């Protein structure tokens, strides 16, 4: 036997475990920062302050880094991710709304029906200034009727009936309802991606997990409905998709843009039945829902707020033409120039919705077309708020979000950061710099990025994802091209058999 001392074979150093441990430690640190920032935004931060804007930006960067690390190599377990997101959502629910008073407007419109037996399309909260919760309503909205659809008015009426005159019970009803909508959306994202990175990307976003729930914004319901409609459209269930889009439109009118994505994707799939059923069903539901309230609803919508919001791309032309902080200092007076811009912004949103839905319709799934069409409003509108991006974020969440999804995700954070800035402070260098970046430069950059990525970035991916050009496209065990992945327990063997059966039936 050779002497063991003569064996000069080098022994490899155990480098793997330290590397894994270091990567895991970094993720735990990032997770702690993301949860801490989310909790701070939801439960501690003042409504508007430069420090809050900085925390929003830090939270966004942390969440992005964490999601990218998990996409490259998953390390965090599902339970860990769920607990982290749950902590943020819980902190958002237990604290009264801090960054928005929308909940009290919802309550006022609901109580008009449940308590005063009046229509929120023909009356305003000021007509009932003796109401138990009237003092909670923001003065800006006390003389405006409901711009929300009949489905949400009915939902708010039911909630305020159950809550009675209790302000705490009322705000908890809306906050917990939106928390439930967020949780269901995250569960559906997990069901179709099986990706903790996708959950982190969506659930720890400072807008989606913290601000949306704490404010009790009904946009969470719209985002859930848009996601469900995409899942139904992918399964060629046009009537069901139309029902969901119609009901979402009866919550907020811009939800109808999701139908543009369904129609575009159906056109590419040469599924005229899907297109017709979705359009006919959604149109019928919206018509029937609004018909009893049409005169009052039309009057309210015609007089809707035409203010330029801080994150809107129309800040630059409004400042040039009107001045006075893009006309915001003149509120409630609205100069004619802002009214013209409002109509132009709606036209731009429509053009973007149709154009980008058309460019993204070649994907295997309708998610991109529906998400692009829906997000067009938040990118182009004169009056756009951070929580409006919740309409498109769930449907764009994926194992590997597209460049378009990243643009919408980033714009959402920038809108929230701009919204958190305080009122103008003369001479504050940091504030003025952030105001210039977030309210003037960022919205224009978001429009350019959204358009370029939508036209060019998604176009390059179409050929590789089109089943005609990609014979290796995965199919689920049911034979549908993969909206929902094969459930656990139905592994590659069954998927392979399904592919063989499909191939034999086509040959």
Residue ranges: model-predicted function:
Residues 150, 164-184, 336-345:
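Loop-to-helix entry region of an early transmembrane alpha helix in multi-pass inner-membrane enzymes
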Residues 75-175:
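Intramembrane catalytic core of multi-pass membrane enzymes that act on lipidic substrates
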Residues 257-284:
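Perimembrane helix-loop-helix junctions
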Residues 80, 189-207:
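Transmembrane-helix signature of polytopic, membrane-embedded enzymes
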